[in-house]
């Protein structure tokens, strides 16, 4: 650490603890999913997000609530960091109608329009056309990139 970084930290202690808590929530969820999958309680494919928790939590800090998200097939962490309830995710993994996709999406196709989380895709790279189409549709419907200040790093500024 240099003198400047000690004088003006990127995040307050409270904010850093909040980020750590979010990362731990994701890890605990994934660890429990791994246990349930190993016990054959979760069927189908299960692509875990272990070791990538900081990515999801960090990315969500730079997004606004109105920003849309299209994820890859390892999307549990992004969904949790976005605010989708773990109970709905768990129900989805169990194939229950109370899941965010009514039990039909499973692990690789989490979707929640209210959270502007437009799901993942089982094909590696398959999310790119979906994201581009979504961005184009939003651009044609309303101007989303205005001169207003983006939320990037807002909580971290000193």
Predicted features and spans:
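Conserved acidic/glycine
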Residues: 1-55
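Positively charged, low-complexity/disordered segments
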Residues: 153-158
């Amino acid at each position: 650490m240099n003198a400047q970084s000690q004088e003006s930290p990127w995040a307050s202690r409270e904010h850093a603890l909040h980020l750590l808590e979010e990362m731990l929530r994701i890890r605990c969820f994934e660890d429990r999913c791994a246990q349930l999958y190993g016990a054959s309680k979760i069927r189908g494919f299960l692509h875990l997000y272990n070791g990538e928790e900081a990515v999801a939590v960090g990315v969500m800090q730079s997004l606004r609530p109105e920003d849309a998200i299209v994820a890859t097939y390892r999307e549990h962490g992004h969904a949790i960091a976005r605010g989708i309830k773990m109970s709905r995710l768990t129900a989805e993994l169990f194939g229950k109608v109370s899941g965010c996709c009514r039990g039909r999406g499973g692990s690789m196709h989490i979707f929640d329009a209210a959270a502007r989380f437009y799901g993942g895709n089982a094909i590696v790279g398959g999310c790119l056309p979906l994201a581009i189409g979504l961005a184009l549709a939003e651009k044609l419907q309303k101007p989303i990139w205005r001169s207003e200040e983006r939320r990037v790093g807002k909580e971290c500024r000193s």
